[in-house]
Amino acid sequence: MKKHLTTFLVILWLYFYRGNGKNQVEQSPQSLIILEGKNCTLQCNYTVSPFSNLRWYKQDTGRGPVSLTIMTFSENTKSNGRYTATLDADTKQSSLHITASQLSDSASYICVVS
């Protein structure tokens, strides 16, 4: 009898909140558990104005954040390997889509708007 091992990925979702009056950045969900090989999408909503750029970072435990994408107001989609970021500047929303997740994707993901 064969044993099948299913690997679960735990994508820690860092809730980032920047609150100074009207400027806020919120991410959801706060954490996500998915099966290896599956796709997932992380969301970022912001009220930052004026808007210069939006960045997605990946931070492995015990390490500093690594930039995945930098998007400006005029960019709608940007890809970096299995990571695809979308930006809708009108609704002030961004998403990070991870395709064919791997164990190495287990990390914190941070959305930064400036």
From Swiss-Prot:
- The cysteines joined by S-S bonds are 44-111
Q: Would I find Cell membrane among this entry's keywords?
A: yes
Keyword line: Adaptive immunity, Cell membrane, Disulfide bond, Glycoprotein, Immunity, Immunoglobulin domain, Membrane, Receptor, Signal, T cell receptor
Q: How does it assemble?
A: Alpha-beta TR is a heterodimer composed of an alpha and beta chain; disulfide-linked. The alpha-beta TR is associated with the transmembrane signaling CD3 coreceptor proteins to form the TR-CD3 (TcR or TCR). The assembly of alpha-beta TR heterodimers with CD3 occurs in the endoplasmic reticulum where a single alpha-beta TR heterodimer associates with one CD3D-CD3E heterodimer, one CD3G-CD3E heterodimer and one CD247 homodimer forming a stable octameric structure. CD3D-CD3E and CD3G-CD3E heterodimers preferentially associate with TR alpha and TR beta chains, respectively.
Pfam families associated with the record: V-set (PF07686)
- Give the subcellular location: Cell membrane
In its UniProt entry, the species of origin is given as: Homo sapiens
- InterPro entries in the record: Ig-like_dom, Ig-like_dom_sf, Ig-like_fold, Ig_V-set, TCR_alpha_variable
The GO biological-process annotations, alphabetized, read as: adaptive immune response; response to bacterium
Q: Tell whether Disulfide bond is among the UniProt keywords.
A: yes
Q: Can you quote a single GO CC term?
A: T cell receptor complex
Protein name (database record): T cell receptor alpha variable 10
Q: Kindly give the CDD domains that the UniProt entry links to this protein.
A: IgV_TCR_alpha (cd04983)
What top-level branch of life does the organism fall under? Eukaryota
What region holds the Ig-like domain? 23-114
Q: Which residues form the signal peptide?
A: 1-21
Q: What is its main location?
A: membrane
- Sites carrying a glycan are 39, 45
Function recorded in the entry? V region of the variable domain of T cell receptor (TR) alpha chain that participates in the antigen recognition. Alpha-beta T cell receptors are antigen specific receptors which are essential to the immune response and are present on the cell surface of T lymphocytes. Recognize peptide-major histocompatibility (MH) (pMH) complexes that are displayed by antigen presenting cells (APC), a prerequisite for efficient T cell adaptive immunity against pathogens.
Q: Which SMART domains match?
A: IGv (SM00406)
